[in-house]
From Swiss-Prot:
GO molecular function, one term: DNA binding
Gene Ontology biological process terms from the UniProt entry: DNA restriction-modification system; methylation; negative regulation of gene expression via chromosomal CpG island methylation
PANTHER family: CYTOSINE-SPECIFIC METHYLTRANSFERASE, DNA (CYTOSINE-5)-METHYLTRANSFERASE 1
UniProt-recorded name of the protein: Type II methylase M.HgiEI
Catalytic activity: a 2'-deoxycytidine in DNA + S-adenosyl-L-methionine = a 5-methyl-2'-deoxycytidine in DNA + S-adenosyl-L-homocysteine + H(+)
Function text: A methylase that recognizes the double-stranded sequence 5'-GGWCC-3', methylates C-? on both strands, and protects the DNA from cleavage by the HgiEI endonuclease. This system is more active than isoschizomeric RM.HgiBI.
UniProt-listed SUPFAM superfamilies: S-adenosyl-L-methionine-dependent methyltransferases
Residues at the active site: 75
Catalytic activity, EC: 2.1.1.37
Top-level class of the enzyme under EC nomenclature: transferase
The family this protein is said to belong to: Belongs to the class I-like SAM-binding methyltransferase superfamily. C5-methyltransferase family.
Pfam families: DNA_methylase (PF00145)
Amino acid sequence: MQQFRFIDLFAGIGGFRLGLEAVGGVCVASAEIDQQAIKVYWQNWPTDGVDHNLGDITQIQQLPAHDVLVGGVPCQPWSIAGKNQAFDDPRGQLWADVIRLVQINQPKAFIFENVKGLVDPRNRLCLEIILDSFKDLGYSVFYKLLNSFDFGVAQNRDRVFIVGIQQKLDLNGFSFPEYAESDQRLYHILDNLEAPETKLESIPIQRNLFGERIEVGYNKLTPRGAFNDFFILNDIRNGPTSIHSWEIYPTTEREKHICMIIMRNRRNSRYGNCDGNPMSYSDIAELVVDLAENELQILVKKRILRQYPDGKYEFFNRRLSGGIDGTYRIFMPNARFFGTLTARGMHDEIAEINVSGANAAEYKYNFIQQVLIPKRYRPITVSEAARLQGFPSTFKFHSNQSANFRLIGNSVAPPVIVALGKRLQCVKLFEQELCEV
């Protein structure tokens, strides 16, 4: 394995560095302005008396000699349309600074990461501007949406990776890494979770006639008729994974019926043009036989419904991601993955025990009775979040726990970077004379 030098832009806590050092990389400098991230970074890579943090990239021109430039470029709100407006947002302007640094310093290769919204069809023009800018600088450019789950990380985390190689050096042709199979479950990774009584087989990768991977939705029931990996606590959708507040709080069968009627009709266009619309008493009375308005008021007191000043009713928990009582999803210990860790925090928790059932309805009922009502679930810890992101147990974090969740959520998953680094090694970029370390 050849050594190579790299510079870590938007370094955060060092996710890129961990990955590239595992495949022969030597970090010659980093750039970061978040003071909490800087503290964690230097706890894990102490300085030798020299500050190698380049600071604000908007103020940088010439970089130290390096072979590969990497970074998780902060995302802009990817809803901008039009070439002349694509980088008006200050966060979008950072892409222009990255392109400028590539132009000035001409690294042999680069790897940049961004949120999956960058490849949304609505943002196609923004993506094309970025790709074309690199191509105009003489680079072969490749991009792909990669999920950390496919690289041994027990997290459903989609991110866009843009890889560039100087055209004159891309002699062997770069290709993105293959997916890796894994039979790990959350009870293997998180602390003090109950293992299932029977061994769960790994789910094989399925391919079509052309050898291409057949993608499986992460929010669908697992193959072979297995029960779902998690439950969603919400009042605005229905399905085998959904649990509603009226199934948790003490309610009569009549009250449950009223709530289901409202849930099934609130998206009807006759009540408004939103995805979900408040409904008046008369609207609901047309759908529920012999409805008394006092019945709705009781549901308001139970914090299942809310009433607006105009008299219309809506669910108290009206936002899907807000969940119920602050919890959105509860994952089972035998789940293959956890929800996406984000810098803004999350409302996902982990069940402490497994449940079983003869069918989906019994499985759901047992979950409510054995996990949900007795509150046998909890948030994940910082060390667990780090493991779910692919950080080693020896990694040192900040003393501020809330800061740690933000920093981990902002980081790239090191195992994905390891896989990308290996692919760069396969191109044999670092056998050239420019790569003297």
